[in-house]
Regions:
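An acidic-aromatic pocket/loop used at catalytic or ligand-binding sites
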Residues: 1-49, 53-196
C-alpha cells in the first residue's frame, strides 16, 4: 500500500512540475509581414484579442502559431499541444456574434492555456456565394489582403490550477481506494457465499 501511495505522490509531483513550467509568451509574436489591426470591429476592445491583416493562408498561419506554442521558455522544454479544429460558426461564441470565419482552430496546453486562431479568407468563404464574396474583401489602410487572422488567448493562474489539480488528485486517490475495497469485498463475498 505504501508503494502505491509513493507512486501516486511521485506522479502528482511530476504533474505539478508540468503545471508550473512557464508557458510560451501569450500573446504570441506578431504574424510576419502582417499589420496588426487597430480597428474597433476586429477586437471590440477585448484585452485578450488581436487581429492581423495578411496574405498568408491557413497552411502558413497554423504552423507558425503551433511553432510558437511548442516549447516553454524554461530550458526550451517541449510542451504537449492538442489542436482542436472547430466549425467556423463557433467563432461567434469565442469572439463575438458578428465574427466572420473560414477556419477556427484551438491550440491547447492541457490544464494550462489555450490559443484560438480564427482565419477569415474572404475568397474561400463557404457561407457566401462566389459572386457575393467581393463585398467582404479585407482592406486595411488602403491595402487589400487575402485574409484576416484573429487570435484570442486564455491563461489560467498557476496557483489555482495547482490547487484544483491536488484536490482532484486527492479525490481520485480516495475513489480508487474505495473502489478497490468494494471489489475486494465483492470477491470475498462470492468466494464465501456462492462458491463452496
Amino acid at each position: 500500500m505504501k508503494k502505491s501511495l509513493l507512486i501516486w505522490l511521485v506522479l502528482g509531483l511530476l504533474f505539478t512540475l508540468y503545471l508550473i513550467i512557464p508557458e510560451p509568451q501569450l500573446p504570441p509574436k506578431d504574424l510576419p509581414d502582417s499589420p496588426k489591426s487597430n480597428l474597433n470591429d476586429d477586437t471590440r476592445h477585448m484585452e485578450d484579442v488581436i487581429a492581423y491583416y495578411t496574405n498568408r493562408y491557413r497552411a502558413e498561419v497554423m504552423p507558425y502559431y503551433l511553432d510558437q506554442m511548442d516549447n516553454s521558455p524554461f530550458l526550451n522544454f517541449a510542451l504537449p499541444n492538442i489542436v482542436i479544429n472547430h466549425p467556423p460558426e463557433f467563432a461567434e461564441t469565442v469572439f463575438f456574434d458578428t465574427k466572420q470565419s473560414y477556419y477556427l482552430e484551438e491550440i491547447v496546453h492541457p490544464f494550462k492555456s489555450t490559443l484560438f486562431v480564427n482565419g477569415y479568407e474572404w475568397e474561400n468563404d463557404v457561407f457566401t456565394s462566389k459572386s457575393s464574396r467581393r463585398q467582404y474583401v479585407q482592406e486595411f489602410e488602403g491595402v487589400v489582403y487575402n485574409s484576416k487572422v484573429t487570435l484570442r488567448w486564455i491563461n489560467s493562474n498557476p496557483l489555482i490550477r495547482i490547487a484544483i489539480f491536488w484536490a482532484a488528485w486527492g479525490i481520485l486517490l480516495t475513489t480508487v481506494k474505495m473502489l478497490i475495497a468494494e471489489i475486494s469485498y465483492f470477491f470475498r463475498f462470492i468466494k464465501n457465499n456462492v462458491i463452496k
